[in-house]
A protein has these predicted regions:
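Flexible glycan-contacting loops in extracellular carbohydrate-active proteins
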Residues: 166-194
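Carbohydrate-binding surfaces in secreted/extracellular proteins
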Residues: 123-160
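Bacterial N-terminal signal peptides
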Residues: 7-17
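N-terminal secretory signal peptides that target proteins for export/translocation
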Residues: 1-3
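Local beta-strand/beta-hairpin segments that build beta-sheet-rich folds
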Residues: 155-169, 216
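Short, aromatic/His-centered strand-loop micro-motif at the edge of beta-sheets
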Residues: 106-130
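Secretory/extracellular carbohydrate-interaction modules
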Residues: 23-105, 118, 255, 259-264, ...
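Extended effector regions of multi-domain proteins
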Residues: 211-291
């Protein structure tokens, strides 16, 4: 199946180091798990504005490995989900080897270089976006296949957005998600409308596959972050705008508990992945090969 190669989805790519005040991060504690090869995550956006990226997980288990996935609000009527992997080295580049017919891909540059995929995805406020990524050894030898899936709530099925095959270059870290830094972030990548409220909650589970996924319950953060609705949250915007959003959702979510620089919050509840989700993740669809 041929895949259309098009221009980038307009995301401003972040490294794990915060580059501007337009981004806030959660820094997850993997609880000693250094070799996770699967991650399941949930993102729920409660207030948004065009030009905002909500990264579910940005992983960097060690040099030179790294990648990220999440959802983005591009334009007033356009949203998407994004999955990308950085180059192993200047000579070893990831390649898309399988993808859904609606997936678009290209090379990216700027803050590092690598392989990028995205798919238009009309996610809604207050609706939880679910994603799953898994790493497996590739048949091609010293490579790792990284598969990314998103749950389509209307059709009630998982979609295989893409598989990106990454050269290991002799580095064990390429095969894992954990073992180094793992972050979620919220970024106003246009730098515009800074007083407009943006709010999202996040949860992550890691393991070696669907049946071994364990919740991550501890996180620190920077910017405006804390706990809300038994999840971690990130927020950006003017004080009055954010206050109005917190009040709007208080009946459903409760009141936020704010973190701060160097401040530790109690762990969130160690909720297991729903049994129906675990079952579905054991029988995922396969997208067509990219020629």
């Amino acid at each position: 199946m041929a895949l259309r190669t098009v221009g980038f989805c307009l995301a401003v790519l972040l490294s794990l180091v915060a580059r501007s005040a337009s981004a806030q991060h959660l820094w997850w504690d993997a609880d000693g798990k250094k070799d996770a090869t699967a991650v399941y995550g949930q993102i729920t956006v409660y207030a948004t504005n065009p030009g905002t990226y909500y990264c579910g997980i940005n992983w960097h288990p060690g040099e030179p490995a790294g990648g990220y996935c999440g959802i983005q609000h591009n334009e007033p009527a356009r949203k998407c989900t994004i999955f990308s992997i950085w180059d192993t080295s200047k000579d070893l580049h990831p390649a898309v080897t399988a993808a859904d017919a609606k997936t678009k891909h290209n090379r990216f540059g700027g803050e590092g270089e690598g392989g990028h995929t995205h798919m238009d995805w009309n996610w809604n406020l207050g609706e939880t976006f679910e994603f799953y990524a898994v790493k497996t050894p590739a048949a091609a030898g010293d490579f790792t296949d990284v598969k990314y899936y998103a749950f389509e709530r209307t059709a009630k099925k998982w979609i295989h957005e893409a598989t990106i095959q990454t050269p290991n270059g002799g580095h064990k870290s390429v095969a894992n998600f954990s073992g180094g830094a793992m972050a979620s972030f919220l970024e106003n990548w246009t730098g515009k409308d800074k007083d407009v409220a943006r709010l999202a909650t996040y949860r992550l589970w890691i393991g070696d596959g669907p049946t071994t996924l364990k919740p991550l319950v501890k996180s620190g953060g920077d910017g405006t972050w804390g706990e809300l609705n038994d999840c971690y949250f990130l927020a950006a915007g003017g004080d009055d705008a954010l206050k109005a959003v917190y009040e709007k959702w208080e009946k459903d979510l409760g009141k936020p508990v704010f973190g701060g620089k160097g401040k530790k919050l109690p762990p969130i509840t160690a909720k297991p992945v729903d049994a129906d989700v675990v079952k579905a993740l054991q029988d995922l669809p396969a997208a067509g090969k990219v020629e």
